[in-house]
Amino acid sequence: MRPLSYIKTMIVKKGIHKCTILTGAFSGLKMNLDFATQTQYYVGTHEKEVHYWLKRFSKDAMVAIDVGMDQGEYALYFLAKTNVKKVFGFEPNSLSLDFFTKNLILNHLENSNRLIVSSKFVNEVDSIESTTLDSLVFEIDNPIVIKIDVDGGEMDVLRGAKKLLAIPNVRLIIETHSPELEIECLNFLSDSGYKTKVIKNAWWRCILPEMRGAGHRKIQHNRWLVAAKKCGIDI
């Protein structure tokens, strides 16, 4: 066990706590957090590297799409801290959806008519259990901000979004889960006319790595990329 993790286990109470996020883009949002694995959410360092781009890309967005909501901090951000007219959220994990629902209630957003949530997987085909981002093409206005965090299915999501990605003024924030997928996503978006940028991990990640799951698992490859096309935002 790393020294910081050991100290944390000695001083932090076990279990789920209702918390208000202290700093960063999500500051002020309320979430149910397990400090055994989610202390970084609380202090505001979770995925800190993309906070700047999240704020920049969503500042004038009309629509936000959160693919892989998990417990919903990005969807909560779009609802509570931006003027987007519609938020589409996708999360197939029932436990994560349950946490998201509780987090909506904590933030008094459970009755928002701006939010549409689906439990379907997002990939390249429409079926009973899955859908594509292209299925939204006729329902949305631009500018559009899309966040994708799907634990290895990044290219499946992008291949099912070719029509959507052809719309002007689309901005993307994508977490990649292997060096090979990072390159594949960059090439796909570049070929689709997007300017892209890899967001390097902060220097302090060697001390505070991103963690995931009940087993407090260190993410072996955890980097983000951003992309935009015809939106007047320099990357």
List the predicted regions and their residue ranges.
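Conserved S-adenosyl-L-methionine
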Residues: S118, Y194-W203
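Conserved SAM/SAH-binding beta-strand->alpha-helix loop
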Residues: N93
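Short, conserved SAM-binding/catalytic segment
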Residues: F100-L115
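Conserved active-site loop/cleft motifs that coordinate metal ions or position small ligands
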Residues: R171-E175, K197-V198
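S-adenosyl-L-methionine
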Residues: M1-F90, D98-N103, L136-E139, I199-I235
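Short internal loop-to-helix segment that lines adenine-nucleotide cofactor pockets
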Residues: Y42-I65, N111-P168, S178-E184, F188-D191
